[in-house]
């Protein structure tokens, strides 16, 4: 790499840092961190643990953003200083180190830019993720369990906490449906990219003839809302059923009817929760999920009306998959919205899906 190229890269970084500083309004974020840290010193801070956790999560998210910006600024400063040294007194070894450092920090700039793209109203929220197999019985239910593992691995890599709110085991293998609550800064902002139909093509382990099968699973993702979201839910519109909770493999995980299923009769929206041992707590959690689903439904209906006005039509049939995972006759995972693809299917199934999410978020912000 020529010195002129190093200088151009350093100038590009300086320009990017100025853009980031303006768009992020860093001074306001730093002031907000101070407010939150002051709030944490109140004697009654932990009286409401849920409220306290929200304050901590907001503070951690803001700190992470400010710290990452500062890390990039420090890296840029170091590159400029090293460049000036080499320009005055050429040093091959030092220049090679600088070139390597440039590659690393440029990658960090790309990662930081992705985080800035998460500027939606609810992107910072926790996420509720649901998986529902399509037709195909055991095949699709097994595919749902594979996707469940993939998302659990992905969330682990992000340092997010995953709770299984509802789990309906498959008849022979896999799952009939599963609902996860994912706690972490920007969980919804990232995972919204996964909403849609996921298609698998493979040689079936359940087919003695070794034939190739295609399976589908629907992934739904919603933001988890705080209590301040304005959604009217009338008690008379709800049907509440209780049942005995089941764990993976079909075993009962509770000896009482603590699991709760709530049906919103006017819309037919159904939510279930069996995470807690207490029926009251399961009902509270289910009501949060219902609120999220009804809000999401309201947004989608508004979007549908806008699409009709514009003459657009969204196809939500099983054929409109967002991503295909092909295990046979070749190995490839391809996102049909962005055309981003990888040949390492095992890596994707182990949770390495940030590349797909990155490509989708960049496409949506073009």
Curated annotation (Swiss-Prot):
Methylated by PrmC. Methylation increases the termination efficiency of RF2. PROSITE patterns: RF_PROK_I. GO terms for cellular component: cytoplasm. The modification N5-methylglutamine is found at residue 251. It is found in: Cytoplasm. Keywords: Cytoplasm, Methylation, Protein biosynthesis. GO terms for molecular function: translation release factor activity, codon specific. Transmembrane segments: none annotated. Its main location: cytoplasm. Peptide chain release factor 2 directs the termination of translation in response to the peptide chain termination codons UGA and UAA. Belongs to the prokaryotic/mitochondrial release factor family. This is Peptide chain release factor 2.
């Amino acid at each position: 790499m020529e010195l002129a190229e190093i200088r151009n890269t350093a100038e590009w970084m300086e320009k990017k840092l100025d853009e980031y500083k303006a768009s992020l309004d860093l001074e306001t974020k730093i002031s907000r961190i101070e407010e939150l840290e002051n709030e944490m010193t109140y004697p009654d801070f932990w009286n409401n643990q849920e409220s306290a956790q929200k304050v901590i999560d907001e503070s951690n998210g803001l700190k992470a953003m400010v710290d990452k910006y500062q890390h990039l600024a420090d890296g840029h400063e170091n590159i400029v200083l090293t460049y000036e040294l080499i320009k005055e007194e050429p040093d091959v070894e030092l220049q090679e180190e600088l070139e390597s450092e440039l590659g690393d920090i440029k990658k960090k700039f790309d990662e930081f830019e992705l985080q800035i793209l998460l500027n939606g109203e609810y992107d910072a929220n926790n996420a509720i993720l649901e998986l529902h197999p399509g037709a195909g019985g055991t095949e699709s239910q097994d595919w749902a369990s594979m996707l469940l593992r993939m998302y659990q691995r992905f969330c682990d890599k992000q340092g997010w906490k995953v709770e299984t709110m509802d789990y309906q085991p498959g008849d022979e293998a896999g799952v009939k449906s599963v609902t996860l609550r994912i706690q972490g800064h920007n969980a919804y902002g990232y995972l919204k990219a996964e909403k849609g139909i996921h298609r698998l093509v493979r040689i079936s382990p359940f087919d003695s003839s070794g034939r190739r099968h295609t399976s589908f699973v629907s992934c739904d993702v919603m933001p988890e809302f705080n209590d301040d979201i304005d959604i009217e839910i009338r008690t008379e519109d709800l049907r509440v059923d209780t049942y005995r909770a089941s764990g993976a493999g079909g075993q009962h995980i509770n000896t009482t009817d603590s699991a709760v299923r709530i049906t919103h009769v006017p819309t037919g929206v159904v939510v279930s929760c069996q995470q807690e041992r207490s029926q009251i707590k399961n009902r509270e959690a289910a009501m949060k999920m219902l609120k999220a689903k009804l809000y999401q439904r309201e947004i989608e209906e508004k979007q549908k009306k806008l699409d009709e006005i514009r003459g657009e039509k969204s196809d939500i049939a099983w054929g409109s998959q967002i991503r295909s995972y092909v295990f046979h006759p070749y190995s490839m995972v391809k996102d049909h919205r962005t055309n981003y693809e990888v040949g390492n299917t095992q890596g994707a199934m182990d949770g390495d899906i940030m590349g797909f999410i990155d490509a989708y978020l960049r496409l949506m912000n073009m």
